[in-house]
Amino acid sequence: MELGSLIRATNLWGYTDLMRELGADPLPFLRRFDIPPGIEHQEDAFMSLAGFVRMLEASAAELDCPDFGLRLARWQGLGILGPVAVIARNAATLFGGLEAIGRYLYVHSPALTLTVSSTTARSNVRFGYEVTEPGIPYPLQGYELSMANAARMIRLLGGPQARARVFSFRHAQLGTDAAYREALGCTVRFGRTWCGFEVDHRLAGRPIDHADPETKRIATKYLESQYLPSDATLSERVVGLARRLLPTGQCSAEAIADQLDMHPRTLQRRLAAEGLRCHDLIERERRAQAARYLAQPGLYLSQIAVLLGYSEQSALNRSCRRWFGMTPRQYRAYGGVSGR
């Protein structure tokens, strides 16, 4: 199975809460779509975008909850964007904040785009949103979740009374008028040629309260140092992808090559030119992540095994003996001081 693009696991915030609110057990859904339970609480964790949007559709259909995506946004908003949120929150204006989100949205998922249409001084500013992942059904709930999150972001950046002028969807109406009114707070149009929203030009130019240019500068520098620039070496890119792919359980040379849009043999050949092997880079990153997770006492060993891409905890035990010369429990007991 092709892994496809990834999305930041914070997009799962509130999923288990909403499922339980609707009287359903979230675990069978998470397992069916190969999403590790609890992954949304792990720093910088990513999951399969295709698995996520398919799970949203299945949840909405099987629970007979057509406004599932709109409801899920109640637990989300700007915070799901991580470091991108800090940049947006400290932009000079609402327009600047939304523009920053569009510029850096690839950090959240490379398959999502938010683009600004050209505008005149006295017109609405249009932001077009698109999920570009090929090979998946049209993500109805994914689009509605994203637009409900956009409405929350507009209120956070522009003030409690800030609202878009209009939200636009390509698909037909799914939920009730009241559901859209509560989640989006403005006119909603369906069956259009584009998905996104329009903001009044005066609201777009509104200054963001308490924005700090220095905080924005620091956050931008951090983000650009963590998410590799275009001149990063191939091995650096492989390590970065391994870090994101491990929790999906599909971290392999083939999956990494797919993310890099190259043949696995080409990947191995180019790494060999750096004196490296893909398997070794994956294992090095897995060991580093194991040490980080084992230092967090709130994580069960079974959870750590899943986050490292293992199907069984026994595989984690064997790896820890190989890496550290002791079991995971011993490693924790000794405070992370390995015998090797």
Swiss-Prot record:
Phenotype of null mutants: Mutant displays altered colony morphology and cell wall structure, reduced contents and altered composition of mycolic acids along with the accumulation of saturated C24 and C26 fatty acids, and enhanced susceptibility to antibiotics, detergents and acidic pH. Also impairs ability to survive in activated macrophages, but not in resting macrophages.
Keyword Mitochondrion: no
SUPFAM superfamilies referenced in this protein's UniProt entry, alphabetically: Homeodomain-like
Keyword flag Transcription regulation: yes
HTH araC/xylS-type domain segment(s): 236-334
Post-translational modification: Phosphorylated by PknK. Phosphorylation increases affinity for the mymA promoter.
Keyword list, A-Z: DNA-binding, Phosphoprotein, Transcription, Transcription regulation, Virulence
Induction: Induced at acidic pH. Negatively autoregulated.
Residue ranges for the DNA-binding region feature of this UniProt entry: 254-275, 301-324
GO molecular function: DNA-binding transcription factor activity; transcription cis-regulatory region binding
Gene Ontology CC terms: cytosol
Gene Ontology biological process: cellular response to acidic pH; positive regulation of DNA-templated transcription
Purpose of the protein: Regulates the expression of the mymA operon (Rv3083-Rv3089).
Protein name: HTH-type transcriptional regulator VirS
Gene assigned in the entry: virS
